[in-house]
Amino acid sequence: MQTTKFFMIGMPGSGKTTYLAMLSNVLVDGNSDTKLYKKVEDMPEGYEYFSDFGKLLLECKELGRTRRLVYNKLRISLWDALENEYLLDVPDISGEVFRDLVKDRQITQEIVDRIRESDCLLFFINYKNMSWEYRIPLPKEITDKKNIDAKKKEILDSNLADKREANQSEIVELLQTILDLKLNRPYIRFVLSAWDKVEAEKGKDILPSKFVEGMFPLLYQFVETNSKYFKAEYWGVSAQGGDFQNPEDVKRIEEEEYNAIKVIEPTGKQSSDLTALLYLG
């Protein structure tokens, strides 16, 4: 059996729970065409928790944020077309935990262990739930890690005490902290949530990497500068399929059901398969 462990990272409101809840729906329903599937007799561990959120999503209702002290995980054996087995073990941790990691440099040993044991880090970002301060022009002369760190610290020190949404400098700070905890060269998939809204603003042909380059220049430059230290990919995901505040979107989602889901791979290939994000083959 091939054991694949993921760890999900993201500030509050970045889309982690929405992804896991809709993934649970898709796996249990079993009628969607996916790269990975569960056997009929297997039920995901933790499904009881995520099913409540899943029902809300199917009713086109927004989810609340994960409570800080609540620690849940989705654990299930999945299979690919060649009958290779993958043990999916993904914890759902409140975004406030990661905010505290940036602000106070505090984190539990259990989370440190999970980060180090992971085969792939899923780093969730929802640009709609970020402060406008993150849109900071990056001077051309900022090209090496030392200068990026200095610029990032300057911005971070002036903003971190606030209780508003995360900004770009905090995202970079979180990424660097996570990298410092890993003991080997990590594999990171940046998951850009609410991709339906990205396409509505930027057009359907935009690649996830180009969106990050234009919207998050500080993050993009950090990733490019440090590419020898970790492997990175950019994915676009709309797990709920649209804007629940938009009546036209709600009508479309109700008609299309799981087909409303959008998953955009780094190459631009589009599907409605949430398991594609978990497939490392």
Where are these regions (language model features)?
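Switch II of P-loop NTPase G domains
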Residues: 65-122, 128-137
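Short, flexible helix-adjacent loops and helix caps
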Residues: 32, 102-103, 200
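Short, charged/polar micro-motifs that form catalytic or ligand-binding hotspots
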Residues: 5-13, 84, 101-112, 161-168, ...
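Short, well-ordered loop/turn elements at secondary-structure boundaries
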Residues: 2-3, 13, 84-85, 116-118, ...
